[in-house]
Regions:
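Metallo-beta-lactamase
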Residues: 85-96
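His/Asp/Glu-rich metal-coordinating catalytic cores
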Residues: 2-9, 13-87, 102-225
Length: 225
């Protein structure tokens, strides 16, 4: 396991599991403390060079084949290679666990609950981020006036590979077996994960609590561990 965030911090969870060449990220979220050092409500990364800023500030890990190819090509960070990341397992759709999904390649499968998908859809519809789709930023075409224009809308929109998981229904991602178990939290659709690898088992608690409407689910997860 490589921890690219979420250690001695609130949020920013980005845990990379590598077993026999199968590579899975668990969450891809924002660290509030880290972002707060550099950005504010009205000051964020540069729109067309955001990946450069996130690398230079040490907010995102430099892993080729992980990020959206239009950004990677723009900053001369590859973009034409195959990805080695097999999937992202999303515990839930709070920004400290999912905020950086818009930076990812669209062909990396994202496994999440139906509730998490709906929450991210709301992010897409009410904001400018791209959780369920990717809109290529640098695609251009020759318009009717013979001038170069930037393509927008459906011409540049690519759907992401969203895979809906079901509670307590195990599945496999190559050599890793995944068991998604519901837990109680302040939003619906939260899942903890138990991963079975060739080197042993890993439990990711997500954010959980022992009170609320689904407290029994949290107890069941603890027992399963």
């Amino acid at each position: 396991i490589t921890f690219h965030g979420g250690v001695k911090d609130i949020g920013g969870n980005k845990f990379l599991v590598d077993s026999k060449g199968t590579k899975i990220f668990m969450d891809f979220g924002m660290s509030f403390s880290q972002e707060g050092q550099f950005f504010s409500q009205f000051l964020g990364p540069r729109t067309s060079n955001s990946l450069i800023d996130m690398f230079d500030l040490g907010i995102l890990p430099k892993i080729k084949g992980l990020y959206r190819r239009d950004y990677a090509r723009h900053m001369d960070f590859g973009g034409n290679e195959d990805t080695e990341i097999d999937a992202v397992l999303l515990t839930h759709a709070h920004v400290d666990h999912c905020a950086y999904i818009p930076y990812l390649r669209e062909d990396i499968p994202i496994y999440c609950s139906e509730e998490s998908k709906l929450i991210m859809q709301n992010f897409d519809e009410t904001g400018s981020e791209q959780y369920l789709t990717l809109k290529e930023r640098f695609q251009v075409y020759e318009n009717n006036k013979g001038e170069i224009s930037r393509a927008t809308g459906d011409k540049v929109t690519i759907p992401r590979k969203i895979k809906i998981l079901e509670s307590e229904k195990p599945f496999s991602i190559d050599s890793i077996d995944v068991n998604p178990l519901p837990v109680d939290h302040s939003i619906p659709g939260v899942h903890a994960f138990i991963l079975h690898t060739s080197d042993g088992s890993i439990a990711n608690t997500a954010d959980l609590r022992f009170h609320g409407r689904r407290a029994d689910d949290t107890e069941k997860f603890v027992e399963a561990c």
